[in-house]
């Protein structure tokens, strides 16, 4: 029993001794490595030889793309590795110590920075420890939220593909002192973004020569290629704009008598202006290119503006004053003949017009009036007016070459017409009958003038209808062409629609 208990105590003592030796080896190794070590000295065996540094990065997330300020914000882990000639040891002399860690500033590390940084601190990395193994291989993995300047080309917005460059290089070492070598970027841990699709992040090593020095200055440039996802902008900007432009076509279908044609056109124009301001808020203030969506909005606003102008012309035609004159001949030929034939439009009541000589006109003379009046004494004004109107049954409508149709001309022979106009009749001794005939002539002239005014107004109203129908067809075709032509001019329009709207 005592022998077994003694064996247990010996095992515990050996374990504690091993732990204390392990800690002692690591402590002694740290003292040996940092003794006489200068963090400002480039750790190479031969000062004439460059120190090779392998550089790569791991892209975790595209956090934001600020189009207005042209800044790309990314979450990146940098990966740098090199061999430190002064940080090597024999593992047999320090058993169990495979690697050690040094904090920032205690050993040498390359001063690699993001050249096109837009951060206020410029260096946005979190300085972590440097991992060193027995062969002197050093590995430095600083994470950081990088803000880099990026030229945003908004020409094809919202169907655009952006390429933002991340240029890394040593800030103080040239190519003869530090040889920067590129490794492929890692995107295995990438977190997808709701606005952008990552298409790739290719890298390239460059060497640049400056006038001050003969040695090259290498840098590693990674190009973050990303495609904008258009579903959000399509639902919130493009589809409303298409619907608003379609509403602009309703201006030509709205009756002129409603009094709302101008109001509808102005309302649509103001709606497009509001959407234009929304796009201007997120776009950079640059004159290098006009965004695709701005081109579409501008063309739609031009269409709506022209529709308002045409609506003013239509309303002027529709409410034309008949005292302002008849329609010009060229206007009648173009609108009432050519355009109406092309649009398959007919004047209202054109098929119901009675031919000029459908009924044989009666000869109207005062003799017939006297015979009708001789049946009874003119004791009532109503009977006299009835006699007068019976004398006007010979009136009919006849077309005229200048204004289409003129109604109300008397179909009487010139002899009888002049006889009536001059008031010469057999019953000169009846003054009441003469007064009645004068009143009848006055009423007939008034009706004749009203008929002519109505014909003139109907011509102008029909011309307004023709202009409305013609502009409806023309503006519809132009709107469809602009919508398809402008939006489909984007290089990746089909790809964006197939991926985002599928």
UniProtKB/Swiss-Prot annotation:
Transmembrane feature ranges: 234-254, 262-282, 295-315, 470-490
Keyword Membrane belongs to the record: yes
Subcellular location(s) per record: Postsynaptic cell membrane; Cell membrane
Disulfide bond sites: 150-164, 212-213
Pfam families from the UniProt entry: Neur_chan_LBD, Neur_chan_memb
Residue ranges annotated as Extracellular topological domain: 23-233
Its membrane topology: Multi-pass membrane protein
Record: glycosylation sites: 46, 90, 133
Primary location group: membrane
Matches recorded under InterPro entries: Neur_chan_lig-bd, Neur_chan_lig-bd_sf, Neur_channel, Neuro-gated_channel_TM_sf, Neuro_actylchol_rec, Neurotrans-gated_channel_TM, Neurotransmitter_ion_chnl_CS, Nicotinic_acetylcholine_rcpt
Catalytic activity: K(+)(in) = K(+)(out); Na(+)(in) = Na(+)(out); Ca(2+)(in) = Ca(2+)(out); choline(out) = choline(in)
Tissues in which the protein is found: Higly expressed in brain. ALso expressed in immune cells sucha as macrophages.
Signal peptide feature range: 1-22
Effect of residue 90 to A: Impairs TMEM35A/NACHO-mediated proper subunit assembly and trafficking to cell membrane
Residues exposed to the Cytoplasmic side: 316-469
Subunit structure: Homopentamer. Can also form heteropentamers with CHRNB2, mainly found in basal forebrain cholinergic neurons. Interacts with RIC3; which is required for proper folding and assembly. Interacts with LYPD6. Interacts with CANX.
Name listed for the protein in its UniProt record: Neuronal acetylcholine receptor subunit alpha-7
